């Protein structure tokens, strides 16, 4: 299977550059199995589409202000994007500079303090930070929010709230689980009143989520690593839901990635650790019965994943419908409620 099989043409003006005033006012494209028709709705219509006893699974990761700037001893400018906090004031990061920094070199940070290069970890660097408080706390005021590269503006104060889900609590992501951005307190209350249950996993979305697939043949693609935690409580919630005839709905590709990484011989089990799972058509997703997901970039691994779930032809039909109806795409864009292909 080729990367180019997942390309499509998107007018640039459909790439959302800012969130709507209300989270749940985003549009929602209902995509049932073929041949049923698509339906244009809003995210706040979700309670009418779900049933009592259904389980919505959210990703509770919290985005850190992970972008930093500084300079090397030579005076060369450096941009740092933290990929993961490692503990002990260390982090794994992408480092952008005119020349690759060497182990032992130090970067003077614009926000104060220094980052010492300890060595390489694949395409990343391991950095030791010398800052006056815990790295996590220091980043809250010293770091910049790492908005995706297709958002063509500098992050503002509103982004600190809006590029974060209302249920974010586990610090560690460098990108938001964007399907969750549509859920506000009124919508969550309406879903609860409907009898819909909520569960959470944690998957810390890494900088690799923005990296393009470079291999033409998908079997040659090396998937990026991300850390996740699927807890015992969530596993029990899923089992109870299924036993009672309810549906499990994953809110976002990160939730599905976490759940599928925790599947063992067709059974969901507690799991904490790294995953490199790469889901493409031909893979059968068993952990969820439906997905809420945003519209994804051409040739992206996320587009490949939802094509595995709902069928590539069906997904591309939905995307063409969304383009024709002027839906908003990508992180701050609209969403779809996606059901699996029949059979």
Curated annotation (Swiss-Prot):
Catalytic activity field: 7-aminomethyl-7-carbaguanosine(34) in tRNA + S-adenosyl-L-methionine = epoxyqueuosine(34) in tRNA + adenine + L-methionine + 2 H(+)
Pathway per the UniProt entry: tRNA modification; tRNA-queuosine biosynthesis
Cited SUPFAM superfamilies: QueA-like
Gene Ontology BP terms: queuosine biosynthetic process; tRNA wobble guanine modification
Highest taxon listed in the record's lineage: Bacteria
Key words, A-Z: Cytoplasm, Queuosine biosynthesis, S-adenosyl-L-methionine, Transferase
Keyword Transport: no
Molecular-function GO term, any one: S-adenosylmethionine:tRNA ribosyltransferase-isomerase activity
UniProt record similarity statement: Belongs to the QueA family.
Subunit structure: Monomer.
Function description: Transfers and isomerizes the ribose moiety from AdoMet to the 7-aminomethyl group of 7-deazaguanine (preQ1-tRNA) to give epoxyqueuosine (oQ-tRNA).
Name the UniProt record assigns to this protein: S-adenosylmethionine:tRNA ribosyltransferase-isomerase
Organism, scientific name: Stenotrophomonas maltophilia (strain R551-3)
Gene assigned in the entry: queA
């Amino acid at each position: 299977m080729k990367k180019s099989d997942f390309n499509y043409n998107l007018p640039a003006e459909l790439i959302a550059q800012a969130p709507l005033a209300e989270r749940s006012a985003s549009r929602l494209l209902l995509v049932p199995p073929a041949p049923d028709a698509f339906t244009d709705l809003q995210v706040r219509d979700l309670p009418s589409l779900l049933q009592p006893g259904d389980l919505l699974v959210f990703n509770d990761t919290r985005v850190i202000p992970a972008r930093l700037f500084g300079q090397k001893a030579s005076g060369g400018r450096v941009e740092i994007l933290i990929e993961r906090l490692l503990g002990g004031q260390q982090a794994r990061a992408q480092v952008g500079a005119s020349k690759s920094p060497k182990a032992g070199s130090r970067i003077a940070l614009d926000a104060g303090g220094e980052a010492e290069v300890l060595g390489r970890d694949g395409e990343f660097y391991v950095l030791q930070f010398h800052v006056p408080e815990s790295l996590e706390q220091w980043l809250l005021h010293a770091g910049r929010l790492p908005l995706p590269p297709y958002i063509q503006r500098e992050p503002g104060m509103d982004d600190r709230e809006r590029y974060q889900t209302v249920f974010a609590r586990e610090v560690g992501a460098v990108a938001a689980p964007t399907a969750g951005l549509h859920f506000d307190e009124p919508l969550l209350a309406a879903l609860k009143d409907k009898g819909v249950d909520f569960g959470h996993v944690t998957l810390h979305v890494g900088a690799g989520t923005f990296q393009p697939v470079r291999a033409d043949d998908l079997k040659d693609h090396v998937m990026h690593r991300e850390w996740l935690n699927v807890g015992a409580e969530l596993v029990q919630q899923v089992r109870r839901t299924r036993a009672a005839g309810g549906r499990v709905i994953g809110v976002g590709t990160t939730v599905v990635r976490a759940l599928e990484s925790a599947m063992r011989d067709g059974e969901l089990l507690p799991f904490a650790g790294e995953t490199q799972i790469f889901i493409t058509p031909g893979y059968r997703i068993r952990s969820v019965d439906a997905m809420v997901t945003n519209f994804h970039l051409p040739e992206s691994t996320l587009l490949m994943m939802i094509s595995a779930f709902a069928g590539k032809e069906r997904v591309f039909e939905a995307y063409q419908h969304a383009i024709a109806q002027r839906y908003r795409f990508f992180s701050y864009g609209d969403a779809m409620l996606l059901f699996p292909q029949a059979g």
